[in-house]
Amino acid sequence: MAAMRSSREPRSDAARNHEALVRAATGAVHREGPRVPMATIAADAGVGIGTLYRHFPSREDLLDYLTHVSFEQVLDNAQAAERGATTAAEALRRFIEAAISQRNELVLPLHGGPPLRSPKTRAIREQIHQILRQIIDRGRADGTIRQNVTPREIVVFGAMLAQPRGPDPDWDMTCRRLLATYLAGLAVPTPP
């Protein structure tokens, strides 16, 4: 009987509750960290604690889910940046700008989220690093990216700029200026 239920589409109220829980949990983790009380998340979502535990049987399940969907989004960003850019520097700029614009939607280890436990999520992280390696290699080959740049450095810098915050146009502008400075620093220096 349970197998039949899992093959059907979720009821519309269950889907709405799931979406509300994910939004509330993301906001609560950004506000209070990964140890935020589960009751706070349920209250923020406007559902009872039982509904929360039906969707996510444990805190770890919830945090793993949030982290996994965040890494899926970052992977989508990396793929789009690689496809849509004509230069390596442009691809890196697009990748990091996407993270900045989504900063309040992502729950990642470098944003105070939990360490990665899921092999599937670790595999997505590796795909992201592989795409960034390809972008960096392209820039090395055409002489526009320094030889010593690593995917990890790109990810860490992007995560620093994409820290969750409330709306602040000045911060967005500051992030974009810092990004431009960073990308200029990645470039191979022109000889005197």
Predicted regions and their residues:
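Basic, helix-initiating cap at the start of DNA-binding domains
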Residues: 1-35, 39-44, 61-64
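Hydrophobic alpha-helical connector segments
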Residues: 65, 72-105, 117-120
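Alpha-helical DNA-contacting segments of helix-turn-helix folds
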Residues: 29, 56, 63-70, 106
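Short hydrophobic/aromatic patch on the recognition helix
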Residues: 46-56
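Short secondary-structure transition hinges
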Residues: 61, 97-134, 159-168
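Helix-turn-helix/winged-helix DNA-binding modules
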Residues: 33-34, 54, 146
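Amphipathic alpha-helical interaction segments
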Residues: 20, 40, 90-98, 153-157, ...
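C-terminal peripheral helix-coil segments that are non-catalytic and often amphipathic
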Residues: 1-5, 94, 130-145, 167-192
